[in-house]
Amino acid sequence: MTHLSFRRVFTLLTLATILFVPVGCRAEQNAAQRKPPPAPEPAEAPPLDEQPAGRVVEVGSAPEGIVADPESGLVAVALRNPNELALVEGESGETLRRVELPESARHLDLAAPGGPVLVPAEGSDSLVQVGLPDGGITSETPVGDFPHSAAAAPSGRIFVVNEMASTASIVEDGREIGKIDTALKPGGVAVTDSGLVGVVGVRGLTLEVFDAGTLESLGRTDAGEGPTHVRAGPESRFYVTDTRGDAVLIYEAGPQPKQIGRVSLPGSPYGIAIDPRRDQLWVTLTAEQRVVQFALEGRTLREIARYPTVRQPNTVAVDPATGRVFVTGKTDGQLQILEPR
């Protein structure tokens, strides 16, 4: 090969290398951009700088997951190490009994007023139902991988979102009768009085709505920068805490899900509860250790008050019969009881 030919070949190889490498880099960059963000988490709360409002009682280790029953007046609180469900008298704050669970839970709900309590036991891949007021386990149903949240339709059909499988299990009469696919990593589920099921994909960053009877999907819509929890409200609306985006998002459920409002709420909003009798919404701010009381006003929310909370207020519940509000303090094993104005 002549010196000139060698230079020509070397130049062509160099150009080919230059042209090839950026294409590969661009492909890797595009793949990285397509990868969904990690699931949002609550802020890690600093030590308290203000006395919590209302009363504070000791409830047990690492409480997270709470629901208040308007018929019995009991409050169910999920604990871990050991994995238990504490049944607390809402008025006095006294723990009446503790129910051993196969695994810990982070979300609780009621199948109906009066119970049973729906307990998605994450590590055991099961839905445990606990009767009220006695605390007896009425059923333990195998479901999908890492059940994170559960909610019941007016018909009694129960929907359990399986976070690691990106599915929802449908449970009737204590047994799983089927599954439906959901958005990536479903972390929250709620059902309207009209039988529409809202599922939040905490990594898919969407709200998807299903018909509870037919299981047909009515569609998906964006759910902010990092949604975590969803609650159903009046007029077939869903309220979603966008924890990473510092907001509460408001949606019409049907005929197709549509975002109709956004309320800015800095402070890492996380836990959320609806008081249907008073048309109020409660949201915990884990970065600021506050719980915020809102009035539901159509497409928006009107702030009523803020209350200092126990440390790491990840979950909140309201007893609609009394208006009493309960907040879990995960760090110190406490339950806060508020009598709002």
List each model region and its residues.
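Predominantly soluble domains enriched in secretory-pathway, periplasmic, or organellar proteins
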Residues: 2-13, 18-341
